[in-house]
Amino acid sequence: MKQVPILVLDFGSQYTQLIARKLRESGVYTEVVPYRESIEDIKARKPQGIILSGGPASVYAEDAYKPDEGIWDLGLPILGICYGMQLITQHFGGSVIAADHHEYGKAKLHIENENSPIFKDVAQDSIVWMSHGDRAERLPEGFEVVGTSENSPYAAIANESKHIYAFQFHPEVHHSVEGTHMLKNFAKYICGCESTWNMGSFAKEKIAQIRAQVGEKKVLCGVSGGVDSSVVAAMLHEALPKEQLICVFVDQGLLRKDEAEQVQDMFKLLDIPLITIDAKKEFMEALAGVTDPEQKRKAIGEKFIEVFDKEAGKHTDVSFLAQGTLYTDVIESVSVKGPSKTIKSHHNVGGLPDWMTFELVEPLREIFKDEVRKLGLELGLPKHMIGRHPFPGPGLAIRVMGEVNEEALRLLRESDAIMQEELRSTGYYDKVWQAFTVLLNVQSVGVMGDNRTYDNTVCVRMVESVDGMTATFAHIPHDVLEGISRRIINEIDGINRVVYDISSKPPATIEWE
């Protein structure tokens, strides 16, 4: 098992992944494991420090989440965040109670001990993000207050001699202005970690692992046109001789305008052989008459398996199947369930369908989405392909409200292409996290020239986000939106109205279906 400098024990917080991402961004390799991880497995990773995440439970509840008691005897530095702070307080003899006033949102942190290494070069007063219903009432012996807020007299505590620290706030959330700095201080000055983690070193390590795993056997790699599968293919191409890699691209007719051609051009540029299967007709037949979003997903998934299985059957000498499983998928498949979100086993995690006998190759299962993009650039993939906005697995099918047909896809593709052109020309494409159009199953009356029209409505959706878990609608200048609307209505026959979605997530989701 590889050495992990910082290990995060997950107690169910919606923010847990952010802890690992913030530390990795600063060059410190970090992994997330369930809070119930055994002390043997923790020791096997040889961590230099442990972080206890937040979570939805109460430490004084009968069924409270508790880590393996052995972690307290390792002598390692520990940082507790929110629920993690309450665990530390309780374990060392302090007391925790339900707070009179729940504290949610921004608060001002005042540092009481500027000499504490956790606060090295951190501003004495800064904004932090609180999200808790319980609080420490009495500190354990040996602990001191190192930070306070208006409603939290124990906002940050420390036992400097034991190298144990605890925050009532969430340093990992971007609203905590100095939070990343505090996490880096914990890793660097308290745990002694070095900033050696980067995509260059990861790529070399992973390429060596692929060569050792695959040997001289063949690998089948399904390519969707998305960033993840393209990066997987590029990494396999770097690791293996050309004759050992079989890349298959199923064109299901649900991609954005010219996207299938762009995928094929990219693989030519990278000199990676690509088998393209034109399955548009089969997918359209499978979607005929289907209007329910979940039924669309099911129909697309079943048809993809059928088409891919048929192609896989032609390659009887293949031993491995490559998948674009991400670290997010791995974490969520074993994560603690909490009220913040429903965690389910991801489609890329947990094995293969019964009909497949391949061994899996998953070169991305240790990294996050933003790291995948950095890895793609490291491997030489074109920036315009790596920087594309997220695109759903079922493709345009879930951006057509109602039945999917060729005419609906035409309207959607053309409107989406115009919107993207306008965003790029005005410099807003890279300023939003995701932007797309949705074809609504709504028609309305309009007037074009002297004629009455009764045509389709398109919704423009643009959001700002860090990771897609939460999102706010993008505040795009009206003249940019007006330009998008004018071009869509004037250039696409069949659309006479454009609306802008100003919903945030939550309560809405980013995609409409």
Swiss-Prot record:
Span of domain GMPS ATP-PPase: 197-388
A molecular function (GO) term: ATP binding
Active site: 82 (nucleophile), 170, 172
Known EC number: 6.3.5.2
Binding positions (ATP): 224-230
Top-level taxonomic group: Bacteria
Gene3D superfamilies, A to Z: 3.30.300.10, 3.40.50.880, HUPs
One GO CC term, this protein: cytosol
Keywords of this entry: ATP-binding, Glutamine amidotransferase, GMP biosynthesis, Ligase, Nucleotide-binding, Purine biosynthesis
Domain Glutamine amidotransferase type-1: 5-196
PROSITE patterns named in the record: GATASE_TYPE_1, GMPS_ATP_PPASE
Oligomeric and partner information: Homodimer.
PANTHER family tied to this protein: GMP SYNTHASE [GLUTAMINE-HYDROLYZING], GMP SYNTHASE-RELATED
Name assigned to this protein: GMP synthase [glutamine-hydrolyzing]
Organism encoding this protein: Sulfurovum sp. (strain NBC37-1)
Gene name for this UniProt entry: guaA
